[in-house]
Amino acid sequence: YFPDLPDNKGLEGITVNTVNQHVFVVKESQPGLLIELDAECRTILSSRCLSKANGFSHPKVGPDKLDFSGLSYDPRSDSLWIVSDQGRCLFQYDWVQDVVLQRLDLEIGEGKRRLVRKAEGVAIDPECGRVYVVSDRDARLYVFKLAAVG
């Protein structure tokens, strides 16, 4: 899953499951990969390919172009929020069931809507139902209010 340099399709994001302290990292693409490590980051416990088979798809982005650039653990729903730069969207993913629960396009602006460009990081505040997404291209932090988390 990790071809020789100068591939630049390596690990992009990291988060911690606050219930069991397991660490998750996401590989950007070719293939997109989610890796679960023990709390000490010494042992790979499991890994999953992120593909159309488990719901990682976007109607405007081909499967070979969809990438993953950040992730955040949500303890309320025991799920992971994974952001895609190329998809300009956010996936809520259930690790146990190995399925995407929902895909949210990262729309911003008043009036004419546009999408966040080059989304590279995500953090969730489950208490407030907010998701924070950082744009590398615009050097901005966007805040999204979720109608229902989980």
Annotated model-derived regions:
Residues Y1-G150:
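Sequence/structural signature of beta-propeller domains
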